[in-house]
C-alpha cells in the first residue's frame, strides 16, 4: 500500500476528493468539471516578440446547473496542509465570482464561504471559514442555498429564473468566465 504522502496531487484528487464529492450527492458528469482553464495566460511583449504567461486553471469547479458555478476546489498533495491551496482557490473564486472556495490535501476540506459573516474579502463581501471531513462535503442543495444568498436571490421566483438556461450551443461551447459574470450580473439586477 502506497502512503498518502507519496501520492501526487492528481492521485489525491482521484482517490480522495472526487469520491468525497460524489458521496455528497454531486453528479460527476453534469456538476463536476476538472482542470478548468479560464484564462489563456497573460500576454508579454518584448520588442517584436510576444509570449503567453501561465494560464489559470482551477482543479475542480462544481456547478449546480450548467453555467452556474457554486464552488471552486484547489487540491494539493498530502505533504501540504488541507488549507494550503486556499489562497489560490480564493483568487480563482474572486476572479470567477464563485461564492465558495475550497482547498484540500485529501485529509479533509477547508471551505470559505465568501458571503456570510466574518472577514471581509476584496469585493467587500464577508468571508467565513469551515473545516469538513471527507465524508461531510456540502451537498449540491447546500451550496445552491449559499449561492442564492451570495447573489441576493431572495424570492423563489428569482432563484427559479436564475436557473433558466441562458446559453446553449450544440457544439458544447460555453461563455467565457467574464461573459458569464456579466450575464449573471444583468440577471441579478433584473430580478432584484
Where are these regions (language model features)?
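ATP-dependent helicase/translocase motor core
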Residues: 1-71, 76-192
Amino acid at each position: 500500500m502506497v502512503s498518502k504522502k507519496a501520492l501526487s496531487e492528481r492521485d489525491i484528487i482521484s482517490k480522495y476528493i472526487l469520491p468525497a464529492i460524489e458521496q455528497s450527492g454531486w453528479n460527476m458528469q453534469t456538476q463536476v468539471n476538472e482542470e478548468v482553464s479560464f484564462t489563456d495566460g497573460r500576454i508579454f511583449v518584448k520588442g517584436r516578440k510576444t509570449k503567453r504567461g501561465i494560464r489559470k486553471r482551477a482543479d475542480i469547479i462544481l456547478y449546480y446547473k450548467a453555467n452556474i458555478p457554486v464552488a471552486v476546489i484547489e487540491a494539493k498533495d498530502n505533504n501540504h496542509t488541507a488549507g494550503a491551496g486556499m489562497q489560490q482557490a480564493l483568487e480563482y473564486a474572486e476572479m470567477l465570482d464563485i461564492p465558495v472556495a475550497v482547498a484540500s490535501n485529501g485529509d479533509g476540506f477547508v471551505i470559505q464561504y465568501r458571503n456570510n459573516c466574518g472577514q471581509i474579502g476584496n469585493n467587500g463581501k464577508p468571508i467565513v471559514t469551515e473545516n469538513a471531513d471527507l465524508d461531510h462535503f456540502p451537498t449540491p442543495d447546500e451550496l445552491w442555498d449559499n449561492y442564492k444568498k451570495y447573489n441576493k436571490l431572495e424570492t423563489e421566483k428569482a432563484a427559479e429564473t436564475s436557473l433558466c438556461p441562458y446559453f446553449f450551443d450544440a457544439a458544447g461551447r460555453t461563455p467565457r468566465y467574464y461573459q458569464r459574470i456579466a450575464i449573471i450580473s444583468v440577471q441579478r439586477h433584473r430580478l432584484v
